Amino acid sequence: MKLAINGFGRIGRNVFKIAFERGIDIVAINDLTDPKTLAHLLKYDSTFGVYNKKVESRDGAIVVDGREIKIIAERDPKNLPWAKLGIDVVIESTGVFSSATSDKGGYLDHVNHAGAKKVILTVPAKDEIKTIVLGVNDHDINSDLKAVSNASCTTNCLAPLAKVLHESFGIEQGLMTTVHAYTNDQRILDLPHSDLRRARAAALSIIPTSTGAAKAVGLVLPELKGKLNGTSMRVPVPTGSIVDLTVQLKKKDVTKEEINSVLRKASETPELKGILGYTEDPIVSSDIKGNSHSSIVDGLETMVLENGFAKILSWYDNEFGYSTRVVDLAQKLVK
């Protein structure tokens, strides 16, 4: 597989490291930043530490352990040389091109104009597109798909959890809160932002904000469409988040032990192994930094009241876990 990455930010760099480790041929990176800066940010990471590879830069390229990766700086995806480079999959990780087409360019330009075979969005799409959450609706992957969304990191955490709960006990309705690490779509000091809460200093407050993650579960689990909603609390950590899911279950006499047993067993199935994790260790968010699971159930925090009213908490590394799924999806798309 020949891979290209469009946008070399937090997700783009993590995708690079995971793909590089698997021996995937990363042909090119498109980013408006110069190669020297891109190489430095790949090597030195405040969250995950120093990259254990030799990283250098040269004119128009970065070199990682002797392998040269072409650096392009093109604003319009229509003009990217994907056909010439023989690109199989583009990872669209700028966060900018979430519509198929627009005056500034769209994600389909990678395929329809630039000549790549397929494109994966690392954000929820703003229009109709196949959304895939691995472990949940992998069966929807087929060779005809040209563009897919890997959904959001929070949907990747929530959907496997909701799937297991719904199949085992039936979900009537539910509400989710993600206690989420801050991201680049917040200000580090008070500055204007279209979301006035995200305008406030990210490391100094708990910041309530919106998320479409719960509603998006309906895209990958149609039977739960309209049954889940949620919100987000951004907190002062750079990575490591947790979903707090409260559900009304159809099974009214369910117990904490039943829920935990079902989730633990599900985490060991071929379908969900490596995607859904389970722990009863008293962990904190820093303990799941660099964890490649989409969702790690915290069995100690499961609660049940009468009449099937339950709360389940599940951790996720919103950067590394999500980026791992992006690479998994790319490999599945070209099989």
From Swiss-Prot:
Its EC number is 1.2.1.12. GO terms for cellular component: cytosol. D-glyceraldehyde 3-phosphate binds at residues 152-154, 183, 198, 211-212, 234. NAD(+) binds at residues 10-11, 31, 75, 122, 184, 318. The record marks 180 as: Activates thiol group during catalysis. Disulfide bonds: none annotated. The active site is at 153 (nucleophile). Keywords: Cytoplasm, Glycolysis, NAD, Nucleotide-binding, Oxidoreductase. It is found in: Cytoplasm. GO terms for molecular function: glyceraldehyde-3-phosphate dehydrogenase (NAD+) (phosphorylating) activity; NAD binding; NADP binding. It comes from the Bacteria. Pathway: Carbohydrate degradation; glycolysis; pyruvate from D-glyceraldehyde 3-phosphate: step 1/5. Pfam families: Gp_dh_C, Gp_dh_N. Coiled coil: none annotated. It catalyses: D-glyceraldehyde 3-phosphate + phosphate + NAD(+) = (2R)-3-phospho-glyceroyl phosphate + NADH + H(+). GO terms for biological process: glucose metabolic process; glycolytic process. Belongs to the glyceraldehyde-3-phosphate dehydrogenase family. Homotetramer. Catalyzes the oxidative phosphorylation of glyceraldehyde 3-phosphate (G3P) to 1,3-bisphosphoglycerate (BPG) using the cofactor NAD. The first reaction step involves the formation of a hemiacetal intermediate between G3P and a cysteine residue, and this hemiacetal intermediate is then oxidized to a thioester, with concomitant reduction of NAD to NADH. The reduced NADH is then exchanged with the second NAD, and the thioester is attacked by a nucleophilic inorganic phosphate to produce BPG. PANTHER family: GLYCERALDEHYDE-3-PHOSPHATE DEHYDROGENASE 2 (PTHR43148). This is Glyceraldehyde-3-phosphate dehydrogenase.
